[in-house]
């Protein structure tokens, strides 16, 4: 969207993801290779998050698949990373990474304190869902990639849950749907 305003720092809790058009943030087994082919970013995309992010909060399953905290935003961002887990004792230590065994609300409090007035990015579908249900997500920052995965890890999956209505930030009508139009890429 050309009218999309850049992210700003302000001590917000952001649920931040790139998602396939069919709602997956990762393929099966947290596979992320789909993001490395045929997907481009708008200019300045990475830099705005590097500048506004004070801390990262993620989950253990994602961490175990990608345990390189130094590679957040291609290595351009440095700061505290918090990994929420029920078993911190068997986690492999890493620089700037703290493994937490606590409630999600406590994890957010810890991350916000460490973020020093900047934003906390939540990079876990499950943790994000729990925080959203508790009213602890300030914004959902979502980037829709022009790809259909068909299987994998959904951004939001809460079978039997109630709908959660959202307001679009910066829109004249915050309840308006977002229209996108794609065509299949040539093989």
Q: Language model features by range: what are they?
A:
Residues 1-187:
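Enzymes that bind and transform nitrogen-containing heteroaromatic metabolites
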